[in-house]
A protein has these predicted regions:
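His-Asp-centered catalytic microenvironments across diverse enzyme cores
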Residues: 41-178
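Active-site neighborhood of thiol-dependent amide/isopeptide-bond enzymes
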Residues: 1-58, 62
Length: 178
């Protein structure tokens, strides 16, 4: 989660917290006021995106965040930017029987067929139904991470950063390309 915006951009991928850091840097470069909202989510919503030993060893409560922007004097909660439309479309194609709530593959929503993922002066969500603890809003990711971070051993953090996140991103890429 402590990966810089420039590293996320250079890597070409990230997860919710690192993409949020990049998004905030871009928003601020455009003089759009923003803040980060921290949470934990239940790991069950990651099943499918995380598989095998990565899923088995993931903590039950996974640190998560979304970005809030102040646009035209109103705050909006933006979460759906963390998953691309191609990936979401592939998930919908793989789960044609799902007409209501969906939880898995990095998604936890009330209405899987009618997602609100495009910003048009509205909130956008993609994992909000998996939230199990709310940490509130912070002006910058560093402030949030000083108070709250992923509860995980040093060994597991190292393994996730150097192996797990790459396996998870590879799995997401496979789903997207099917």
């Amino acid at each position: 989660d402590g990966i810089s915006a420039s590293k996320v951009l250079a890597d070409g991928y990230g997860q919710c917290n690192t993409k949020g850091t990049l998004f905030m840097a871009l928003l601020r470069a455009c003089n759009i006021p923003c803040r980060v909202h921290g949470f934990t989510i239940d790991k069950s919503l990651q099943k499918g995106a995380m598989t095998g030993f990565v899923y088995r060893n993931a903590p039950k409560n996974i640190f998560h965040s979304w970005i809030e922007i102040n646009f035209e004097n109103q705050w909006y909660e933006l979460e759906a930017f963390i998953l691309d439309k191609t990936y979401i479309k592939k998930l919908q194609e793989r789960n044609p029987e799902c007409k209501g709530a969906f939880c898995g593959y990095g998604v936890a929503v009330k209405d899987f067929r009618n997602l609100i993922i495009e910003f048009d002066r509205n909130n956008t969500y993609i994992q909000s139904e998996g939230i199990n603890q709310d940490f509130g809003v912070y002006d910058c990711p560093d402030e949030l991470l000083k108070e709250h971070h992923q509860e995980i051993s040093a060994f597991k953090a190292f393994a996730y950063r150097h192996i797990g996140r790459h396996l998870m991103n590879r799995n997401v890429r496979k789903i997207r390309e099917r």
